[in-house]
Amino acid sequence: MKSHGIVHKYGDNVDTDVIIPARYLNSSDPKELAKKCMEDIDKEFVNRVNLGDIMVANKNFGCGSSREHAPIAIKASGISCVIAETFARIFYRNAINIGLPIIECKEAARDIDAGNEVEIDFDSGIITNLTKGTSYQGQAFPEFMQKIMKADGLINYINEQLEAV
Amino acid sequence: MGMTMTQKILAAHANLPEVKAGQLIEANLDLVLANDITGPVAIHEIQRLKKKTVFDKDKIALVPDHFTPNKDIKSAEHCKCVREFAKEHDITNYFEIGEMGIEHALLPEKGLIVAGETCIGADSHTCTYGALGAFSTGVGSTDMGAGMITGKAWFKVPAAIKFILTGEPKEWVSGKDVILHIIGMIGVDGALYKSMEFVGAGIKNLTMDDRFTIANMAIEAGAKNGIFPVDDLTISYMKEHGAKPYTIYEADEDAEYEQIITINLSELEPTVAFPHLPENTKTVKEAGEVRIDQVVIGSCTNGRIGDLRIAAKVLEGRKVAKGMRAIVFPATQAIYLQAIEEGLIQTFIKAGCVVSTPTCGPCLGGHMGILAAGERAASTTNRNFVGRMGHVESEVYLCSPAVAAASAVTGKISEPSELFS
């Protein structure tokens, strides 16, 4: 599985309130949430983003509220993967559970710039920066999380477990 | 190798003799929580599951508290979705507004969570119950929905930071100042993926309300959970609130901690977190002249009776500054009633505050006290991110109830002692 797109770059501590502000949480429709994604930190994001694009950020991405609407909004906006130096733990779980690919890679997070063209190979964890001609080794997921992702999220994984019983 | 308090609770709930940091386990859950924002997403996910019956109708809590009383049609529909789910599955602990409260104040008050138990909640401040010596942590809707059906959740066993608390806090210094000080010290990702375990002789000088406040904001340092040892005060609290059987776990002598931090409570000062991160802390003395437009006293962090008593003590016989909007939110109906009986509500109203029904409203910028561009609030809530309480160009300063009340009187971030000298 690969993803390939243009980078939207952010800094440290991007919290779930700016990813999807609470005033929009009276909807749980992914399409509606996607229209408001990143509004409080990057008003132009929704106009700029194309299907397959990649989000890159520094430390502690997705901190704060546990709202699953945050990874849902990012995924529904067309983003194919989020690369960050570190993720807040609830966001990390939520992303895996809803099938939004995420990769922790300090080197990539620091070196990749906004607008760079990037390709990610999820099987090897290798991130290639086509603009700069550099590549970085992202962290591989534990086997258990890979199983959840292969099943395309926690719900399908649990269904598989229920069938096996 | 010994285990931390958190690791012991997780091992017991995973039916394992021991667990180690980094190990992936599946743990049995004693309580699963959702609210009106996260519930509908989970209920939608549950429809996709092959098993649709809940694991235990007595071990699920559904608390519509965020956009309630319903702020608009969409919120009303979300609440209706949760209400109908509760009815369909005969959920014992569903709380309509007349019997409700903000979830993290309500659940301990109702005795639904006690020492030694495990809880996941689709709300990041679920870590509050660590004050009772329980393992509780925030998750997303899918994890929570899966938990409601299976009664289990997977966890990566956390490493831990030990905080040794010594001494006694000065007058006007409370749990909020302690946790703001800690977050200022270690940063908003200082405890990322880890447990914050609080120990030491200073704990006996912290009320249960102080401990709830501290555990509540563990997430603001990125922690998986915050946890306190169980002492006589915890036991009497649990007995007063439902007397469910509990189990006391203690960390082993040789438990491993990634970091040990000692904090002398007597050295702490009233503290405030500047925009736009809870880690941007200064003492109130260092804050300088920060004019404010609105004060919010309440929330799952600071809306308990002890918090209201402190705020009333400051506001007694005083008036809020001209042009100040001061809003008080008792965290539950029971706390509201107690505040009426103790005369606290009269004090607030005479001082020129408004008093609201329990709701999460302003804390997350939902309703009931939204800020316009350029406005500033001093708030006893838990987050001050960009746009958290309203407009992206508004600002939130996090503080204790004592500092919030004093600031309401002076119109700027102030220490209560300024009013009592």
Swiss-Prot record, chain A:
The keyword Amino-acid biosynthesis applies. CDD domains: IPMI_Swivel (cd01577). InterPro entries: Aconitase/3IPM_dehydase_swvl (IPR015928), AconitaseA/IPMdHydase_ssu_swvl (IPR000573), IPMI_Swivel (IPR033940), LeuD (IPR050075), LeuD/DmdB_bac (IPR011824), LeuD_type2/HacB/DmdB (IPR011827). Pathway: Amino-acid biosynthesis; L-leucine biosynthesis; L-leucine from 3-methyl-2-oxobutanoate: step 2/4. Its EC number is 4.2.1.33. Keywords: Amino-acid biosynthesis, Branched-chain amino acid biosynthesis, Leucine biosynthesis, Lyase. GO terms for molecular function: 3-isopropylmalate dehydratase activity. It comes from the Bacteria. The keyword Electron transport does not apply. PANTHER family: 3-ISOPROPYLMALATE DEHYDRATASE SMALL SUBUNIT 1, 3-ISOPROPYLMALATE DEHYDRATASE SMALL SUBUNIT 2-RELATED-RELATED. Belongs to the LeuD family. LeuD type 2 subfamily. This is 3-isopropylmalate dehydratase small subunit. The gene is leuD.
From Swiss-Prot, chain B:
GO terms for molecular function: 3-isopropylmalate dehydratase activity; 4 iron, 4 sulfur cluster binding; metal ion binding. It comes from the Bacteria. CDD domains: IPMI. It catalyses: (2R,3S)-3-isopropylmalate = (2S)-2-isopropylmalate. Its EC number is 4.2.1.33. Its cofactor is [4Fe-4S] cluster. GO terms for biological process: L-leucine biosynthetic process. [4Fe-4S] cluster binds at residues 300, 360, 363. Keywords: 4Fe-4S, Amino-acid biosynthesis, Branched-chain amino acid biosynthesis, Iron, Iron-sulfur, Leucine biosynthesis, Lyase, Metal-binding. InterPro entries: Acnase/IPM_dHydase_lsu_aba_1/3, Acoase/IPM_deHydtase_lsu_aba, Aconitase_4Fe-4S_BS, Aconitase_4Fe-4S_dom, HAcnase/IPMdehydase_lsu_prok, Homoacnase/IPMdehydase_lsu, IPM_dehydratase_rel_enz, IPMI_cat. Pathway: Amino-acid biosynthesis; L-leucine biosynthesis; L-leucine from 3-methyl-2-oxobutanoate: step 2/4. Binds 1 [4Fe-4S] cluster per subunit. Heterodimer of LeuC and LeuD. Belongs to the aconitase/IPM isomerase family. LeuC type 2 subfamily. PANTHER family: 3-ISOPROPYLMALATE DEHYDRATASE LARGE SUBUNIT 2 (PTHR43822:SF16), HOMOACONITASE, MITOCHONDRIAL-RELATED (PTHR43822). Catalyzes the isomerization between 2-isopropylmalate and 3-isopropylmalate, via the formation of 2-isopropylmaleate. This is 3-isopropylmalate dehydratase large subunit. The lineage of its organism: Bacteria, Bacillati, Bacillota, Clostridia, Lachnospirales. The gene is leuC.
